[in-house]
Amino acid sequence: IEECFADEYVAVVTGGRAENQALLNQRFDKIFFTGGKTVGREVLRHAAKYLTPVTLELGGKSPCIVDSTAKIPLAARRIVFGKYLNCGQTCVAPDYILCDKAIRDQLTDAIKSEIRRQFGKHPLENPNYGKIINRKHFQRLQGLIDSSKVVIGGQSDAKILRIAPTVMKNVTWEDAVMGEEIFGPILPILTYESLDDAIQTVESHPHPLALYFFSEDKAAQKKVLDRCHFGGGCINDTIIHLATSEMGFGGVGNSG
């Protein structure tokens, strides 16, 4: 960046809370913030002093709904890609799966097979598989894994801060992994009885930054798009909505 831009145009500042506070006291023309809700509120509070326009991208638990008409192999391949990209450390990663109860086992098996295909039998040894950003986050993620519900993965290596692609089923909203945005390579699978139940579940929680829906039913697709509130998303894919510059990017409510 320094080779291309003078400091007065583009500057990168790294640091912690002290640096954040110093930046927030500057009189910027525009602030675009990516982070969590707590700091997002602080950004808005400081920006109000100068009436500075703000765009917030605050993440959240982005659902991936899969109904009984979905093409299971396709869904598994694209969910695994979207979830484990950068070890799940992306703001728009599918946070959890909400699938039709009738296809749970079939979808779970397909996801397990796809994880092995994409990352090998020993992903912790795969040089192309990433690591967790720091030790604090690594330990936090380990605390979200319930070994009794793991169907693949769960292994970790503290020396290199790696956690294998992990899938958990028989998960409920009372589990620790559902209490906050995961931001890591852990994929909980929950089920629903009807699509209306799934929509009600999504809408009963803070609006997510992204939503993904796998279905071949056009009416079902329209229902989800009409009734669910979210920032951006895809039908029969994940993540790829970021690839177009023709769409805006942001969340709704707590997600930005």
Where are these regions (language model features)?
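Short amphipathic alpha-helical segments
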Residues: 24-25, 43-46, 109-110, 225-226, ...
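Short hydrophobic/charged patches on amphipathic alpha-helices used for structural packing
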Residues: 20-21, 76, 199, 222
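PLP-dependent aminotransferase-like
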Residues: 1-18
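Generic structural signal for residues in well-ordered beta-strands
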Residues: 10-12, 54, 150, 189
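Conserved C-terminal structural/oligomerization subdomain of aldehyde/semialdehyde dehydrogenase
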Residues: 28, 65, 116, 162-256
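ALDH superfamily catalytic-core signature
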Residues: 29-30, 36-173, 195-196, 200, ...
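Beta-loop-alpha module in the N-terminal Rossmann-like domain of NAD(P)-dependent dehydrogenases
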Residues: 14-22, 26-27, 35-42
